[in-house]
């Protein structure tokens, strides 16, 4: 068995750390192949811009659709058009050893490592097959989670270790998953930015974001909702989310 993984990242040099230890051994044995695509190489403006301000306001920047889409296109041209794309994000399903054991047989895989406040939601809708999280905490980007996943999968390759060493992590904190992010352009194909984010009504934007966070958490991490004592307003927003999604 050989593991083939492509990574979309603004910082491919971070992955030099994988040349040591178990993963380094797998690379030398040709049991693991890693390839990298930097979205900045696919930016079309003179400044090689990969991020922009978020619609609806708020802190930070959001990674733009086009450079990521072009990087993914290049990755799929090399690895195969049907290669699954995995986005590493706190909004994803919790990565477990069972998932690692399952996905090692899904190689090749493309891992998408975001930065800043997140990735334009329309890129996720159009290109991402699954979203995974390594835990309920925030990191500066998706590179470390991608390395965690690569490490966990590589350890299961026959012959890389003297034996298969499984581990589990069950330390969580209560909270809600993030709401969707959008940045320019205002419309991509048939996917427009939600109109409320263009309204300039900050109260309505805050309400929409909380509703999306509650709904997304219920859909993906009900355990977090069950730990949380919802206020009357939060319960009302969650009910609205169900009605709008039905």
Swiss-Prot record:
One of its GO terms (molecular function) is tRNA (guanine(37)-N1)-methyltransferase activity. It is an enzyme of class 2 (transferase). Coiled coil: none annotated. Its EC number is 2.1.1.228. GO terms for biological process: tRNA N1-guanine methylation. The keyword Cytoplasm applies. The keyword S-adenosyl-L-methionine applies. S-adenosyl-L-methionine binds at residues 114, 134-139. Transmembrane segments: none annotated. It catalyses: guanosine(37) in tRNA + S-adenosyl-L-methionine = N(1)-methylguanosine(37) in tRNA + S-adenosyl-L-homocysteine + H(+). It is found in: Cytoplasm. GO terms for cellular component: cytosol. Keywords: Cytoplasm, Methyltransferase, S-adenosyl-L-methionine, Transferase, tRNA processing. Disulfide bonds: none annotated. NCBIfam families: PRK00026.1, trmD. Homodimer. Specifically methylates guanosine-37 in various tRNAs. Belongs to the RNA methyltransferase TrmD family. This is tRNA (guanine-N(1)-)-methyltransferase. It comes from Coxiella burnetii (strain Dugway 5J108-111).
């Amino acid at each position: 068995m050989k593991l083939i993984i492509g990574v979309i990242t603004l910082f491919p040099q971070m992955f030099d750390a994988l040349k040591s230890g178990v993963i380094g051994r797998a690379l030398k044995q040709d049991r693991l192949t890693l390839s990298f695509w930097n979205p900045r190489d696919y930016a079309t403006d003179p400044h090689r811009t990969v991020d922009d301000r978020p619609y609806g306001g708020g802190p930070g920047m959001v990674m733009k659709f086009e450079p990521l889409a072009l990087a993914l296109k290049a990755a799929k041209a090399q690895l195969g058009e049907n290669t699954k794309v995995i986005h590493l994000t706190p909004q994803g399903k919790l990565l477990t050893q069972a998932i690692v054991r399952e996905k090692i047989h899904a190689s090749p895989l493309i891992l998408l490592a975001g930065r800043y406040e997140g990735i334009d939601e329309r890129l996720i809708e159009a290109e991402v097959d699954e979203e995974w999280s390594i835990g309920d905490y925030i990191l500066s980007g998706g590179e470390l989670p991608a390395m965690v996943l690569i490490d966990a999968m590589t350890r299961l390759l026959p012959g890389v270790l003297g034996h298969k060493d499984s581990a589990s992590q069950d330390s969580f904190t209560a909270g809600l998953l993030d709401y969707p992010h959008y940045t320019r352009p205002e419309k991509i194909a048939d996917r427009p930015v939600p109109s409320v984010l263009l309204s300039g009504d900050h109260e309505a934007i805050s309400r929409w974001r909380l509703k999306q966070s509650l709904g997304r958490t219920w859909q993906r991490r009900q355990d977090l909702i069950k730990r949380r004592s919802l206020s009357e307003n939060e319960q009302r927003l969650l009910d609205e989310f169900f009605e709008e999604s039905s």
